[in-house]
């Protein structure tokens, strides 16, 4: 008989963006809402803004220089090395757009 192995659950990567429809040059704020069902905790976060910019931390901010469609990716890792990612598309409008 083989010994039982404990299967750990993957962390859940989640985040929100404010404002959801920014203008070029406007600062957006991101808020990590990730969790670890196993309770080990999130050790680090890496953000990729889709325009070459990156950040770490739970609540970074970012400015897109140009209007366009971008995908923001958050990757999180738990203290025991499990990874998860979440993606959100953001449509950055021209500075004068309503």
How should each PLM-predicted stretch be described?
Residues 1-98:
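Extracellular/lumenal mature domains of secreted and surface-exposed proteins
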């Amino acid at each position: 008989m083989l010994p039982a192995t404990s299967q750990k659950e993957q962390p859940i990567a989640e985040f929100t963006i404010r404002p959801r429809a920014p203008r070029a040059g406007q600062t957006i704020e991101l808020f990590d809402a990730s969790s670890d069902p196993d309770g080990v905790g999130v050790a680090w976060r890496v953000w990729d803004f889709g325009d070459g910019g990156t950040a770490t931390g739970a609540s970074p901010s970012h400015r897109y220089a140009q209007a366009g469609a971008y995908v923001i990716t958050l990757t999180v890792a738990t203290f025991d090395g499990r990874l998860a990612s979440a993606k959100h598309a953001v449509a950055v409008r021209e500075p004068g757009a309503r």
